[in-house]
């Protein structure tokens, strides 16, 4: 990939400043608004926050992992960083578009790269109805909550909640309950990425529910509608021998 203008984002309070200084010497970095790609140094959280902040620029992101898991990141390799970027492969992620309404009628709209989730706000389990493409599919789910995950996000919170990992090119979404109480044996559903999913919260006064789109949280929600959108494609760069698809496969075999 022919990339000449690169911007660099990092946490100035990072404990890895010595490594960051090495990376800073590799390029004559430009302003973010002038960049053809953005390098983000940190972990998955730093990458997600900066994707949300700069996705409107429609340029690719290359993550360098200095965090823990770093599922969406590339391993630290300062010696070959320039070569790795220019030989990198591109993965296109289509985020989820969430529209949520709270008890006052306020409407919120947000994008999620990993997942949209709803969850109980108090000690009482949440109760909600699930519609898919305008058709009621479950009249009442009693659970701590539920989430809808993209393929890229299926190995994160979704996997911890018992949901399956989706191949990146599967064109599907995971609908996964969080600690389902009734129906107790329901483990969720796989849906086409073209599906529109709606959660209708029941007993909102006694059983309040919050909703999140990645790290953005909204309180006292009564309705949540979620669908995948191709209007804002996100481009992630990965080393040619360390692609996101490979990581998703390895994760399923304990890698």
UniProtKB/Swiss-Prot annotation:
Enzyme kind, highest EC tier: transferase
Pfam families tied to this protein: NAD_kinase, NAD_kinase_C
InterPro entries named in the record: ATP-NAD_kinase_N, ATP-NAD_kinase_PpnK-typ_C, NAD/diacylglycerol_kinase_sf, NADK
Catalytic reaction(s) noted: NAD(+) + ATP = ADP + NADP(+) + H(+)
Function: Involved in the regulation of the intracellular balance of NAD and NADP, and is a key enzyme in the biosynthesis of NADP. Catalyzes specifically the phosphorylation on 2'-hydroxyl of the adenosine moiety of NAD to yield NADP.
Any one GO molecular function term: NAD+ kinase activity
Protein origin, superkingdom: Bacteria
Record gene name: nadK
Sorted UniProt keywords: ATP-binding, Cytoplasm, Kinase, NAD, NADP, Nucleotide-binding, Transferase
Location of the active site: 44 (proton acceptor)
Compartments, record wording: Cytoplasm
Residues that coordinate or bind NAD(+): 44-45, 49, 114-115, 144, 152, 155-160, 216
GO cellular component terms attached to this protein's record: cytoplasm
Name of the protein in question: NAD kinase
Cofactor dependency: a divalent metal cation
EC number: 2.7.1.23
GO biological process: NAD metabolic process; NADP biosynthetic process
Homology family: Belongs to the NAD kinase family.
Lineage: Bacteria, Pseudomonadati, Pseudomonadota, Alphaproteobacteria, Rickettsiales
